[in-house]
């Protein structure tokens, strides 16, 4: 039973959520046996592939490198995954915008059900995932020959990014599907920890009354604690902070060691 993890990366390095996805794959490995492979699909992505090869527990890295994969267009990544999909019992991706865009396409092409945002592995075919906005946990069993899974990063502790010694193998890249084109990307640069991986989060809600109060009250505290800043949906809708601050069901899923909520009801 070999498991393929689709790496989320920026062509130069592996994003932290990939380590959580590999952790889930290693639990699958423990209950069913087999190897863990990682696919890096990008352009000029040798550095990312080399970083993936160092991840603890990974036995092989598949590198698909071509211009049509540079920006992670889902149609091209999915087609490349399909070139190797039949060799795997499980295809795993982190439940990020990237993973959620690719995994359903792979599942549709394989004519199997996708299992979304798992937080625990019970056996090789049985998983747990949150439902009803996290108020209940569903146990899901799949009889499909290939399980296509997205992993909620907060459900699994990340594996070590160093210590592995996997081989890197270049694979055939599918031709450009020509169904979409990359237009632009706006990257938000923060001096603080990223919300989804932060150990400490200071979050504000509508009770703060204004964006000015949010800045005045919360930023000094976050500075002292070296914390990430978050916000409720109500605070975002009121215009206190940008959308990428939003925490929760319709925002970012977080699992800090300390969460300080100010002016948030419910």
Describe each region flagged by the PLM:
Residues 1-266:
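N-terminal glycine-rich FAD/FM-binding segment characteristic of electron-transfer flavoproteins
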